[in-house]
UniProtKB/Swiss-Prot annotation:
Subunit composition and interactions: Homodimer. Heterotetramer of two MnmE and two MnmG subunits.
Entry binding sites for FAD: G10, G11, G12, H13, A14, G15, V122, S177, Q366
GO molecular function: flavin adenine dinucleotide binding
This protein's GO CC annotations: cytosol
PANTHER family, per database record: GLUCOSE INHIBITED DIVISION PROTEIN A, PROTEIN MTO1 HOMOLOG, MITOCHONDRIAL
Job of this protein: NAD-binding protein involved in the addition of a carboxymethylaminomethyl (cmnm) group at the wobble position (U34) of certain tRNAs, forming tRNA-cmnm(5)s(2)U34.
Keyword Ubl conjugation belongs to the record: no
Family: Belongs to the MnmG family.
Residues given in the record as NAD(+) binding sites: 269-283
Protein name, entry field: tRNA uridine 5-carboxymethylaminomethyl modification enzyme MnmG
SUPFAM superfamilies reported in the protein's UniProt record: FAD/NAD(P)-binding domain
């Protein structure tokens, strides 16, 4: 009988990262997915990254994950979002050629050390004494294992809706999984329904682009991965159009036919990625909504109209599309649809992503209530790392709110749960100025090296970058001019007769990297390696970063204050019954987690700390 250390069920964005991370740590790993085409499949929009999401991709890359490198092999339209705003909210994004992305992912995984891939369907999980033992395939064969990672996406009791039509499916033309859903229910997991949707696909050859606005990408694509020196994929343009009052009228007239508004769907959809029906109802005063026409590939005429996700009947979809400028004569290749699926309350998992009920069972991706490729991949890499570390009886790997967006996401999910699809935003992070896309490797790669999940190749690249940063910093502290000379160049500085280094100049609000290069031309050769930009940001926001680091230190001290598993909150007399019940239900593991629970007062936190000091003065936390 076959036996593996770790089995990953599902080959989507969470699954591939989980499998690869587990394999990198030396665990014998099996990835089970329905068919080869599912590896890295982009079920919805053909793009990676965006605001906050781009930072997640960079963090995955920092831990030697796949997503950043793979998009660099298939990215056809790179754009830094929010670049006119502060660096804390910059969002690297790349449009993908679906075929190139999947091809690159498949090539990497099929040659990955310690990783086998099985194309088949898992029907059930064998559990004994609250611990995983094996997976059971739909042909009744059994594969033994120590750990299982479930990355089922929208396949758990998946149901597609197009108008009044219902189609049991995990994705178009793919069967859902009922066996796994039933098993999770039997075990006692809290299961609910969520919904997501996708727009119709249209034929780019039938679009009148003269009625649309051009959306060019960045002149020079900035790679996602530290392993990529330059993006060699041809770059293309996207286009923008918009809905009209006629579009809105058609949608309003047919709302009763929408699966969303007829009461047919019980699952809650993503708040920040609403269907076009939702937009018309929720933002009724808006006369138009933008639609981004995104090509799905270099040699593919399919266009993804980002912004009109819908579950209206096919005939209504055809009507509303014809009212959009440039799409009057467009051919619809595939209708849009909504899909409803099961998910598990993420408070059922710990920060390692292992379930609390079943030892050795991990969840990652949409099963935890998230939406988005990047959110799924971020969970996948953490689940894969922790499953492999557990096999080797090593300490778990936990990211926190203080060092990563991945940590913020996992903390949000495991502390608060979610009743709607969770999407990452910069606003969710209290330390976003410190947790930027440009410094993800400096925050996380060394942590990855310490546990052995980072390859030698990446380790060498990272070590050299750190050395180059120190050399560049030294140079920027050496290059200087007098204040009088700077004034003659039109740079406003206090005339105190001192010398100002480049790092000093970077702190001037109106001063930028381009000016520094103009004054010191030798800096131009450093412009392309991103180090100059990194040091510019660090200098520009030095005072803010210093304050934020103090906040982070306070946060970390509270995270280090463990709360014993056997604590009885009802024995702490100075806190209310409501708070005692809330703490008993949430079971926070640290003072930091307890503080973040809604309704827990500062006075209650103080009472807990005092109680711990008196009751557990010996340092016991069992």
């Amino acid at each position: 009988m076959l036996k593996y250390d770790v089995i990953v069920i599902g080959g989507g964005h969470a699954g591939v990262e989980a499998a690869a991370a587990s394999a990198r740590l030396g665990a014998s790993t099996l990835l089970i997915t329905l068919k080869p085409e599912n590896l890295g499949e982009m079920s919805c929009n053909p793009a990676i990254g965006g605001i906050a999401k781009g930072t997640l991709v960079k963090e995955i890359d920092a831990l030697d994950g796949l997503m950043g490198y793979v998009i660099d092999q298939g990215g056809i339209h790179y754009k830094m979002l929010n670049e006119t705003r502060g660096p804390a909210v910059w969002g690297p994004r790349a449009q993908a050629d679906r075929k190139l992305y999947k091809k690159a992912m498949c090539q990497i995984l099929t040659n990955y050390p310690n990783l086998d891939i099985l194309y088949g369907k898992v029907e059930d999980i064998e559990i004994k004494s609250s611990k995983v033992e094996a997976v059971i395939l739909n042909n009744d064969s059994k594969i033994l294992c120590q750990k299982i990672i479930l990355t089922t996406g929208t396949f758990l009791s998946g149901l597609i809706h197009i108008g009044q039509k219902k189609i049991p499916a995990g994705r178009v033309d793919e069967e859902p999984s009922y066996g796994l859903s039933n098993t999770l229910k039997k075990v006692g997991f809290k299961i609910a329904r969520l919904k997501t949707g996708t727009p119709p696909r249209i034929d780019g050859r039938t679009i009148d682009y003269s009625k649309t606005a051009l959306q060019p990408g960045d002149k020079t694509p900035r790679p996602f991965s530290e392993l990529t020196s330059v993006v060699n994929v041809p770059q293309i343009n996207c286009f923008i159009t918009k809905t009209t009052s006629e579009t809105h009228d058609i949608i309003r007239e047919n709302l009763n036919k929408s699966a969303m508004y007829s009461g047919q769907i019980e699952g809650i959809g993503p708040r920040y990625c609403p269907s076009i029906e939702d937009k018309i109802v929720r933002f009724s005063t808006k006369s138009e909504h933008r639609i981004f026409l995104e090509p799905e590939g270099l040699d593919d005429y399919t266009i993804y109209p980002n912004g009109i996700s819908t579950s209206l009947p096919e005939d209504v979809q055809h009507k509303l599309i014809k009212t959009i400028p440039g799409l009057e004569n467009v051919k619809v290749l595939r209708p849009g649809y909504a899909i409803e699926y099961d998910y598990v309350d993420p408070r059922e998992i710990s920060v390692t992503l292992e379930t609390k009920k079943i030892a050795g069972l991990y969840f990652a991706g949409q099963i935890n209530g998230t939406t988005g490729y990047e959110e799924a991949a971020g969970q996948g890499i953490i689940a894969g790392i922790n499953a492999a570390l557990a096999v080797k009886d090593q300490a778990p790997f936990m990211l926190t709110r203080a060092n990563s967006y991945i940590g913020v996401m996992i903390d949000d999910l495991t502390t608060f749960g979610t009743i709607e699809p969770y999407r990452m935003f910069t606003s969710r992070s209290e330390y976003r100025l410190s947790l930027r896309a440009d410094n993800a490797d400096l925050r996380l790669t060394e942590l990855g090296i310490n546990i052995g999940v980072v390859s030698e190749k990446r380790k060498k690249i990272f070590t050299k970058k750190c050395e180059d940063i120190e050399k560049t910093k030294l140079l920027l502290n050496t290059l200087s001019l007098t204040t009088s000379k700077l004034a003659k160049m039109g740079i406003q500085v206090a005339q105190d007769g001192t010398y100002k280094t480049v790092l000093d100049l970077f702190k001037i609000p109106s001063f930028n990297v381009e000016q520094a290069i103009k004054i010191f031309p030798m800096l131009k050769e450093m412009q392309n390696n991103n180090i100059l930009q990194l040091l510019y940001i660090e200098a520009k926001y030095a005072s803010y970063l210093t304050r934020q680091h103090a906040d982070i230190n306070l946060f970390q001290s509270e995270e280090a204050q463990l709360i014993p598993k056997n604590i009885d909150y009802f024995k702490i007399p100075s806190i209310s019954l409501e708070i005692q019940e809330k703490l008993s239900s949430h079971k926070p593991t640290t003072i930091g987690v307890a503080r973040r629970i809604s309704g827990i007062t500062p006075a209650a936190i103080t009472a807990i700390i005092i109680y711990l000091k008196t009751k557990y003065s010996d340092g016991s936390s069992t």
